[in-house]
């Protein structure tokens, strides 16, 4: 509390001169030469008394005339001063009312703008909250698309590797097919040679079979001829035997039989040897031909089977290669489509992110601009409050000095609460000291006197003013928020902006004020309904305990210049906070005025709006 010192020095000097209007004082001298009678003596005394009374009456009349003239002059001066004061007061009142109306209009516009800004900020926060999930969703979709693109790219690399491997296998199989074709051609030529050999062997076999048949027929013919010759020889020998001695016949027959048997054995042995040789040679040739034919047939069949298998394998590989080429073409088309889609999605996502960032930047710039405008309006309002308060003090002082009855005015609170700021003006006291000093000298004459007055008043005033400003910052993660925390530590108010009921069992509300900290833990069964509020009162607030909307704790909330209120849930996670910081703003005002020509100057110290106060007071006074 700063003191306001007012020093009023009044110096009044008046010089009066007495101008005799008529008559002179006569001294009655009573001669002692003649004897006086009592009647004469009484008459002389009465005459002297009448003369003295006449002199006094003349002085009184002169004094009354002077006083009436002075009174008339003072009345005119007073009327002129009253007219001047009334005119100045009317002008001051008009200017004050005009400035007050403008200030009220500006305050209303500021309140409307503040409400509009709060609505816009809330809408922007809601839009931001709505856009954040969409941004997260789009980011997740972009991440999934990138993962799919990488997956498809990996698949494409695998398919491309398989395709390259298939091309290598195809080239290898083509080389093998060429080698097999050459081998097949060689085997075909070998088969032709074997067929020719088989035909030659078949011809040789036929020739051998014909020779064998010829030899058999020849042998049969010789056997028949031999048998016929034997028969003829027997018949001749029989005839001869019949003619020879029986003994000789028997010897001869025995010898003949032996010779024939030897000859037969010889021929049969020779025939058997020849037959065995022929059969062995034939069998060998046949076996060789069969083996060669089997080898040729097996080689041809193997070559044919290999050619068929190779053709089948080549056809399968060609079909597989065609399928792989078709699959590769489809995958390439799909990859190009996905790449185009991914590029489009990336461009759209980047454009969306850019638009969101531009919108957020625009919103930040707009919020910063609106906050600057609001800060300017708050500064203007503070300066206007200071000007209005100083003007009200000065006007009250002038009204008291001029004994002007002013109509009752509603007192306005100097506290301001707007958009998280609270201003409180500390009451300022003003002490004044009026020191009138004057000098009046008058020389009364017999017939009267005239007086001239000069009055001069010097007033020095100074005023110190201190204002306290509270800046508020509130934040909430869920539906439950802290909407108000009393600066005097009487209560803290919570509000559920959602529609569902919130169970407060295990929740804790902590107040940190300077070095002091106090925690209030909600009891079991505490809750707050949707759209409702709950207030936690200090023990000295004088409020009854009425759950669930009014809760009274056993202690008092601490108070300091910097206060922080934090609401934590049952998991010890902070869900809401409310910060209030106090800042002091001081101002100094000085005023100097004289009674001749009012001249006033004001100087504001560190308070805001000193230029406006100076200009306003220069305009008013």
UniProtKB/Swiss-Prot annotation:
Annotated keywords: Coiled coil, Intermediate filament, Nucleus, Phosphoprotein
Region Linker 2, annotated ranges: 234-257
Residue ranges annotated as motif Nuclear localization signal: 453-458
Region listing for Linker 1, in residue ranges: 86-95
Region feature Coil 1A, mapped onto this chain: 47-85
Record-listed Phosphothreonine modification sites: 443
Region ranges (Coil 1B): 96-233
Main location as per UniProt: nucleus
GO CC terms: lamin filament; nuclear envelope; nuclear lamina; nuclear periphery; spindle envelope
PROSITE patterns: IF_ROD_2 (PS51842), LTD (PS51841)
UniProt record, GO biological process: chromatin organization; heterochromatin formation; male meiosis cytokinesis; muscle tissue morphogenesis; nuclear envelope organization; nuclear migration; nuclear pore localization; protein localization to nuclear envelope
Family of the protein in this entry: Belongs to the intermediate filament family.
Function: Lamins are components of the nuclear lamina, a fibrous layer on the nucleoplasmic side of the inner nuclear membrane, which is thought to provide a framework for the nuclear envelope and may also interact with chromatin. In spermatocytes, regulates cytokinesis during meiosis.
Protein name per its UniProtKB record: Lamin-C
Organism annotation: Drosophila melanogaster
This protein's encoding gene: LamC
């Amino acid at each position: 509390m700063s003191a306001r010192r007012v020093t009023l020095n009044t110096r009044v000097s008046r010089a009066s001169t007495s101008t005799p209007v008529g008559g002179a004082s006569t001294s009655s001298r009573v001669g002692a030469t003649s004897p006086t009678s009592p009647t004469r003596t009484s008459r002389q005394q009465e005459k002297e008394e009448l003369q003295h009374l006449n002199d006094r009456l003349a002085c009184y009349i002169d004094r009354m005339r002077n006083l009436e003239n002075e009174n008339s002059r003072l009345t005119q001066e007073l009327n002129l001063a009253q007219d001047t004061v009334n005119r100045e007061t009317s002008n001051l009142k008009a200017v004050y009312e005009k400035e007050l109306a403008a200030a009220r209009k500006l305050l209303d516009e500021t309140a409307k703008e503040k409400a509009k800004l709060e609505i816009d900020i809330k809408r922007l926060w809601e839009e931001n909250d709505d856009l954040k999930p969409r941004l997260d969703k789009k980011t997740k979709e972009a991440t999934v698309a990138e993962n799919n693109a990488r997956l498809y790219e990996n698949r494409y690399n695998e398919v491309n590797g398989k395709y390259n491997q298939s091309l290598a296998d195809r080239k290898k199989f083509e080389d093998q097919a060429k080698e097999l074709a050459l081998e097949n051609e060689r085997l075909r030529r070998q088969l032709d040679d074997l067929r020719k050999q088989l035909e030659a062997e078949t011809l040789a076999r036929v020739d051998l079979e014909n020779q064998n048949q010829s030899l058999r027929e020849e042998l049969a013919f010789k056997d028949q001829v031999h048998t016929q010759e034997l028969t003829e020889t027997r018949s001749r020998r029989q005839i001869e035997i019949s003619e020879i001695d029986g003994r000789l016949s028997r010897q001869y027959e025995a010898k003949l039989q032996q010779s024939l048997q030897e000859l037969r054995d010889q021929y049969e042995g020779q025939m058997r040897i020849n037959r065995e040789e022929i059969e062995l040679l034939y069998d060998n040739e046949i076996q060789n031909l069969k083996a060669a034919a089997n080898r040729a047939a097996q080689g041809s069949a193997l070559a044919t089977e290999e050619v068929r298998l190779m053709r089948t394998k080549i056809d399968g590989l060609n079909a597989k290669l065609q399928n792989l080429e078709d699959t590769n073409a489809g995958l390439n088309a799909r990859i190009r489509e996905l790449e185009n889609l991914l590029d489009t999605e990336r461009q759209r996502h980047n454009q969306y992110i850019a638009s969101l960032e531009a919108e957020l930047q625009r919103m930040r710039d707009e919020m910063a601009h609106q906050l600057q405008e609001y800060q300017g309006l708050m500064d203007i309002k503070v300066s206007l409050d200071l000007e209005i308060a100083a003007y009200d003090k000065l006007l009250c002082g002038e009204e008291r000095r001029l004994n002007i009855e002013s109509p009752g005015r509603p007192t306005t609170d100097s506290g301001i609460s707007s958009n998280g700021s609270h201003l409180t003006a500390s009451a300022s006291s003003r002490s004044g000291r009026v020191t009138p000093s004057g000098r009046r000298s008058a020389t009364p004459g017999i017939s009267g006197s005239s007086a001239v007055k000069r009055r001069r008043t010097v007033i020095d005033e100074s005023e110190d003013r201190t204002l306290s400003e509270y800046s508020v910052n509130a934040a909430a993660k869920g539906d439950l928020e802290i909407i108000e925390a009393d600066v005097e530590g009487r209560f803290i108010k919570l509000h559920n902006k959602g529609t569902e009921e919130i169970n407060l069992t295990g929740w804790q509300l902590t107040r940190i004020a300077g070095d002091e900290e106090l925690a209030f833990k909600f009891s079991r069964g505490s809750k707050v309904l949707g759209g409702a509020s709950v207030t936690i009162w200090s023990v000295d607030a004088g409020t009854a305990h009425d759950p669930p909307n009014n809760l009274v704790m056993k202690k008092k909330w601490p108070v300091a210049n910097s206060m922080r209120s934090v609401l934590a849930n049952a998991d010890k996670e902070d869900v809401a906070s409310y910060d209030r910081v106090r800042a002091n703003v001081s101002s100094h005002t000085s005023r100097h005025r004289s009674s001749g020509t009012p001249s006033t100057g004001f100087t504001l110290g560190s308070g805001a709006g000193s230029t406006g106060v100076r200009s306003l007071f220069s305009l008013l006074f």
